[in-house]
């Protein structure tokens, strides 16, 4: 037996059972769901950082979308927030690395 205690995609129980194994599943309440989504997004970021694979970014996007739904924020609303931040602060297109800040005389 392997213990997991992690949020999985909706079809994973069927995939496990199709492989001849059994699994125990718990349906989370809304508060638990957000907590486990937050853990999941960290997991997906780490998987992307380790592998560099675009497929991991797709997983990250899926978790991000689930968080938005759980927080009752539409993807369009989220995109407006993103664009507003780009308008005010820019994006990451110029590949700028801030090394230090200082005032005259420092």
PLM feature segments, named:
Residues 1-106:
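Flexible "arm" and connector segments at domain edges
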